[in-house]
């Protein structure tokens, strides 16, 4: 779902993350800060981490008594494992990661939504005549992540096909393959797919997303921890989310400045300043629900996701929604 970056970039990203931690502790040098290891969902930084950067640089974490260390996992399948093993305390994962983990009896708990709707789908080159009606026999790109694996069966079902009717191509970068015509569609969310293709071509892509792609309208990303960590460190989880809420509000109200701050914090992320600015501007509308609230989860979102995953045979049974989440740690809004 997200563009991968080279290992050399990842090394610089880790160094950049360390410098962010250092900046957040300067103003609170005389105060004992509680360390929180935060694991991202991807091996390198991208613009969706902008609220965390804002919370660091604006001092929101420090004001809540926290020293947050950002960790980038070795691959897209490890963040949940790092939470369950204690290598990370709080993480950023997809709702499908949660569903798969809970099905495997992992003790994860989603404590806040990041986004509120499903903006994932298929993206083709500008001017393409491709539609779901002619999807059969086409080559679709996948990052090999849990979310893409979970969503593709919905797409082929919408098209009246089976997974065997398409070819799934997995590689480290989608754009060269798309531009060279070696794949017909790439898969992504609109806040990544649009700036990626626009940056490469100067034009907006042909896109089929959300309901048009047949995917359930559920949040894509959540903040998660383990049930044991949430129980033993409830005040830390609450403080973290309060700081992240402030960071999210700041980054939403100051979009250009926040995107520029991310670019400056991670100059070797592999993304351009223009990409980060456009990507973040497309992310902001996804962060609040119909009532303008951040973070709030519902039984309905988890039930809808489970119904789809059971129907497409990706999980065997659907647990009760309360198995997945709690709103008990959310700050007042």
What are these regions (language model features)?
Residues 163-166, 268-279, 316-323:
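Short, surface-exposed acidic
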Residues 1-35, 332-333:
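Short, low-complexity disordered leader/linker segments with a strong preference
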Residues 96, 174-268:
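Pocket-lining segment of extracytoplasmic ligand-binding domains
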Residues 70-71, 110, 168, 251-262, ...:
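Surface-exposed patches in mature extracellular/periplasmic domains of secreted proteins
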Residues 232-312:
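Secondary-structure end/capping motifs
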Residues 30-180, 184-191, 206-208, 217:
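Short, glycine-/small- and polar/acidic-enriched structural segments
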Residues 302-333:
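Conserved C-terminal helix/tail region of periplasmic/extracytoplasmic solute-binding proteins
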